[in-house]
Amino acid sequence: MDTLNLYDILENIGKKLYQNDNTAWLELQEVLPQLNTFISEAVQISEGMKRTVLSVFPQLLEAIENTDQLLTADTVYYEICDIIAVYEKMSNNRQITLHEKANLDTSNIDTNKIFENNMKCLKEQPNDYYKKLEVYCRQFDLSDEEIAVDEYGNIAILKEDRWWRVNSFYNSKYAAEFASEEIKKQNYISCLYVFGMGNFDTLRTLAKIVPSDTIVFIYEPNPKIFAVNSYYHDWSDVVSKKNVLLFVEGLNEQELIRCTFDRMENVAFLHSYVYIQPEYGRIYAAEISEKIVECKKMIRNAVYTDNTIDK
């Protein structure tokens, strides 16, 4: 079989999953028979290869069954593509460059320093509705059983009796670059709604590539994800930006609608863009859908008000 072609297909599917492109799911279903054929050949190479394949492939099927986007993306782009690369080297002496993983040597995270820097950032913001965010973070218990974070800052949330990743566990910064590609294609975005903060890598990338006058609304449906990020990821460079506004469910989410009305203009209505972080559309679909409907309604009201001539 053409394993190089299979590699290219799976690599592209992995990228699409990181980009939140739902066409990847159909493409993955279509390539599964070809992948099955490859597996039947790969397990015969060596006992080590057999153990790896029999560990990874069931993980992929379980991820697909649960529509677990980031686990599927990590499994396809890193684990299965790596298996194919090793197979090619062993069987055909052809070299395929392995996908770069994050440098795990930099796992010494000073959570106290990061946390205080983030809290300092919140205090310096002129918006009063950030005060609740600081209070919540200072009272948050990092041993909470519904959220997990490892020594590298990878975050997973417990929902529907299973753990869901909110960022790539192999190279979240690299995955964030994939996620930003669609944003880069837009001629201009005056207002960007980002639903879900993940581990802030994607947010940091998006905040860098949009014009400085673009209003960025960030909505996080789970306050525990925000709290954990406050200890493990320095997000002060993002939140301190003049046109970046942060809203967290249960803390200051009601301000999202008000700020939408206050800051929206006709140009923002015409050039607004919604980005939903991978996985969030699956595990927080109801919360995000509700906020999108509310924001759309407020945008229409803002446009109507802006175009109304007082008699």
Predicted regions and their residues:
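Residue-level signal for cytosolic alpha-helical hairpin/rod architecture
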Residues: 10, 57-58
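Alpha-solenoid helical-repeat scaffolds
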Residues: 3, 47-50
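Short terminal alpha-helical segments
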Residues: 1-38
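Long, low-complexity or tandemly repetitive, helically biased scaffold regions used
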Residues: 43-44, 58, 62-68
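Short helix-adjacent coil turns
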Residues: 19-23, 64-72
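Short, charged, amphipathic alpha-helical segments
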Residues: 26-30, 72-78
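N-terminal donor/sugar-recognition subdomains of glycan-related enzymes
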Residues: 19-20, 26, 33, 40, ...
